[in-house]
Amino acid sequence: HLFEHLMFGGSLNIPEYDMPLQIAGGENNAFTNNDITNYYLTIPSENIETGFWLESDRMLELDFSQKTLDTQKKVVIEEFNQRYLNQPYGDAILQLRPLAYKKHPYRWPTIGMDISHIEKVDLEQIKKFFFSHYAPNNAIIALTGNITYNTASELAKKWFGPVERRKVLRRNIPSEP
């Protein structure tokens, strides 16, 4: 979940991710679950190339700064507090997961089991995660709206073609007893 937030912190070329998207009439959001992180844009079809540019650029040159990491840690810790600690029975799901799953990664909430998991993350761990998961060969682009397959394919090649393919970490998921 923390990494989802960091993806909106800008890239080396585009320090404010939201600004060019909003100028193009678009908006964005994301969600994370145990299997995927889904980043999505809603943008007028005449500005679709702006979306490709933004997505490929942050996959290519995400800005790994300590300042952004520190800021987003605070945001995610506040989310953790609001969602799990400041609500009656809010932490019930945190207690339930390890009872349901003994070995499987589903035992871990995407936000972390407790605040210390968020606090302990450092910039090197963030970089390692990025370079072992965020690559064109580990991404799915889904488009709907007023765009043809040929146009989508051409734009994907244009904007993601130059992004280096990476050795993607494959999860070895243990079976439950």
Language model features with spans:
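Scaffold signal of the M16-like zinc-metallopeptidase fold and its non-catalytic homologs
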Residues: 6, 10-11, 51, 83-136, ...
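M16/insulysin-pitrilysin zinc metalloprotease superfamily fold
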Residues: 10-11, 42-75
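Short, solvent-exposed loop/turn segments at the edges of secondary structure
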Residues: 16, 21-23, 33-36, 91, ...
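Acidic/histidine-enriched alpha-helical segments
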Residues: 19-23, 63-81, 148, 167-177
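Extracytoplasmic
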Residues: 23, 34-38, 71, 93-96, ...
